[in-house]
Amino acid sequence: MWIIFLIIGLLVLGLLVLLIIAARYQRDYWRYLDIPHERPKKLWPIIRQIMTQTLSTEAMKAEHYSAIYKKFKGSGPFCGFYALLQPRALILDRELIRQIMIKDFWNFNDRGLYCNQKSDPLSGDLYALRGESWKEMRQKLDPSLEGDRMSLLYDCLYEEAEQLLLTVNSTLMSQPHSTVHIQKIMRRYVLSSLAKCVFGLNAEQRKTYPLEDFEQMTELALNSHKHGYLMNLMMIRFPNFCRMLRMRRTPKQAEEYFIKLLTSIVEQRETSGKPQKDYLQLLIDVKALEFITYQYEADKELGAHLQNELAAHADVFLKAGYEQTANTLSYVLYELALHPELQVRVREEVKKAIERHDGHITHEGIKSLSFMGQVINETLRMHPITPYILRRTLNDYAVPDHPKYILVKELFLIIPTHAIHHDPDIYPDPEEFKPDRWSGPRDSLQEQGTWFGFGVGARSCIGIQFAQLQLRLALALLLSEYEFSLNTRKPLINLEDGIALTLMPLGVIEPGNEERAV
């Protein structure tokens, strides 16, 4: 019997030795390659962070990657660092960024996100897919969001912008002061726009599916941490194994809600035969075309597959456009309140566009607002949607002109967008809000490695024009009716602190402020 225990003990000891050797190798991975790198933390601090659930928070902070960028900038095309004990590369060179995002994109089209289309249909969206699966879906969806299609969605989005104005009016009338917490209102506006224009949730449909339920399920899908940080890392690191275990990203309750909602609305439209002017109708048209193009043995199987795919298409707008668009709107209004002279310029531009179009805010008028576009670009520079872009290599990649720098297969890459947007060598006075830095001729080649407002290259945001229309309509209507100012001079640290703005209806004359009348 003791021999059995001895053998088991030796096996356990051997396994521990192998784990220690592997961990030691991982800790020294970049040192062995002679690549400049940030040393990994010691084991006990990592364990403490895991226990206190602070590891993921640190990894998401802009300061985390900005510090590495500043420390190693100029040392080579990229530097190394570690997530737990996993080696990762932080890209430093603009030319290498262009190669990754555009020139050699075929080798870097993986965002490193976990998806499981069989067990978790909503995870199989454009945001998470890779390789040929991503390419096929992108080719199907690109035509649905081309410029001329936006004119079909204009009325739908305009109605939501008008509703935003009514919400602001009612909010101000229901309270004794003129201060509002703007990001809450912006989140509601963006969510309602997506519910109506992407999910087909109009006033009639909201009797069955109230917007409050839609908001609750959206928050559940986006912010519910179904798995802990380590398990999420495992899903990213070993996706095939996790698919065998049928692991999911989307809470089952949220998945059932969105699929049921879309199935109900799509069936109603297909039965009535009345097309609508919204994005859901464009997705239904894509689905109908696929149904004709592909032949399955069972039409029922094809229908279920395409319905789940349609739900994933719609759901990606929530994942990539809800919080991001609402936050950008909040930051734009904050910066304009902080810089009233710029707010006046945007308002005057909107006023002239309205005059040119017979007193109406038209689609053409919205597209002509060049200075507003500069303000949005500068806001996205100072307050980027995400502090970094994540990519993973599909095959080994030798960095041109740098023989010792190899991006090995399955290596995670970080492009530090926040750090690059605040690099004084690229943007002089990076902490100052200067929309006029975007007024000259645009160098698209230069911007490919220095500005990431909506992403770069083939995997840039598919809904750029949709988001731009949402942003511009809201700003045009709000600035046409209100003057925004800060009710505090305290600097904004982040949106979690809240943005409280004071709103003054244009044309209202306060005692001692007669010059504010318009």
Swiss-Prot record:
GO molecular function: heme binding; iron ion binding; monooxygenase activity; oxidoreductase activity, acting on paired donors, with incorporation or reduction of molecular oxygen
Keyword Iron belongs to the record: yes
Primary localisation category: endoplasmic reticulum
Binding-site residues, heme: C461
Superkingdom, natural source: Eukaryota
InterPro entries linked: Cyt_P450, Cyt_P450_CS, Cyt_P450_E_grp-I, Cyt_P450_sf, Insect_CytP450_Detox
GO cellular component: endoplasmic reticulum membrane
Membrane topology reported for the UniProt record: Peripheral membrane protein
Keyword Heme: yes
UniProt keywords, alphabetically: Endoplasmic reticulum, Heme, Iron, Membrane, Metal-binding, Microsome, Monooxygenase, Oxidoreductase
Cofactor(s) this protein cannot do without: heme
EC numbers: 1.14.-.-
CDD domains on file: CYP6-like
PROSITE patterns: CYTOCHROME_P450
Subcellular location: Endoplasmic reticulum membrane; Microsome membrane
Family to which this protein belongs: Belongs to the cytochrome P450 family.
Its biological purpose: May be involved in the metabolism of insect hormones and in the breakdown of synthetic insecticides.
Name by which UniProt lists this protein: Probable cytochrome P450 317a1
